[in-house]
Amino acid sequence: MTGLTQALAAFVSKPSFGDNEQAALAVAKTGFMDTIATMMAGHNEPVVNIVRQFFANTTTPAEAPVPFLGTMHPSAQAAFITAVAGHALDYDDVALSGHPSTALVPAILAEGYVLNSSGLEALRAYVVGYEVWAELVSRETDQYHLKGWHPTGVFGAVGAAAAVAYLRRLNEADTRQALAISASLASGLVANFGTMTKPFHAGRAAAHGIEAVRLSMLGMTSAADVFEHPAGYLNALSKAGRVDRTRPADTLGKTLRILETGLSIKRYPVCYSAHRTIDGVLKIADTENLQAAEIKNVHITTGVAQASMLRNHHPVTGLEAKFSAEFAVASAIVAREVGLAQLTDSFATRSDVSGLYSKVSIETVDTVCPLDPAFALTDRVTIETNDGRKFDSGAIRFPLGNALNPIDAAGLKRKFLDCLETGKVANSSIKGADVGLYDRIATLETLPSLRQLFK
């Protein structure tokens, strides 16, 4: 039987998507659209400036652009900076217990620029990276977040390496080396959620994917069984050792997980664990016209892993607020919105907002969503007012924007343009000067070269 590491390498070096390729590429294109949008929106965040300053004296060779800076950088460095920007606002898409696009897209954009890859090849590389990530994460029955792992950093490095190895057309042997090297570069801790280090995880993952491939091309060796070995990647990451290291990976390329799991597009720039709660609170608050002064208590029922990510119960900064169920509830009630405008230090500490934090209680349940084990099967919100009225959201499983409750193309375009406006990035399609960035991404499969994307 072919081992997992070898099976992954075989798929990456010679992928086959069958009759479902076009549908898979459409999902990948959504990943590019959403990531480039959030990258543009987040490029002015302090963490991006810190990373840019860190690299200020090491900008050669000039291989790939950082579009929002208008500067050229070494490929891995460009991927690092753009991935940090894409994840800085925590507004980027979600799947596979993490944020696949914010690791995959920056790595593909950077190396694709170096290689003069076409838009079609970029989309195929995304699918390759996604499928490798999906194969690995599907083998664990427990929740990575409860072990302290941030899957975006842990799986992102391997997924990015797979995508870049495909772009580079590495043979099977070199691909295996690259994937195994990337396995030793996997990192990212939940304890750093709500700080600048969380988007740093995405930056490192994208850069590590490129570095692993280039090290392999230079002849660096690595274990031929790194993923399935008892002292290897999957066992080391596993919370209780119940990970399946021996299952054949014979469905790779035959059953495309990108079509089963898809991508969930965030409507709110906060941890996805809070999105069900926000939908529930907004539904009740809007229907009943509830005001903050009327609230006696708000009770949330959610998953154990979700609650572990929402670790800030009394946030005092906009960053901390992104990982706070209490803030999500308060913002939804006070502002009837949980958006970028609310994610500020001043709003998080406003008396009418912070006054609600102590009125929020959280109950965890052990149910698991079979589509994403980081989530409970459903969440629920109940609100009680000072005059004794009680309101119940009912079971909430798929928030709007989820892959199984998707926003439409018009909604995705609105988010894209809003992100560009937030980042103060001019979009030529608005001015009518040319087809514009949005339209170039929307027709990415027809673009002869990625170098034409950010013209």
Language-model segment annotations:
Residues 94-101, 149-154:
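Short helix-coil transition sites and intra-membrane helix breaks within transmembrane domains
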Residues 77-95, 103-118, 125, 132:
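Function-dense linear segments that define catalytic or interfacial modules
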Residues 113-211, 223-230:
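Glycine-rich, mobile lid/loop segments that gate access to catalytic sites or pores
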Residues 101-109, 156-163, 207-211, 274-276, ...:
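Well-ordered alpha-helical segments within folded domains of soluble proteins
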Residues 1-98, 190, 194-207, 214-455:
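Terminal-appendage/accessory-domain detector
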Residues 25, 29, 33, 104, ...:
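Hydrophobic face of alpha-helices
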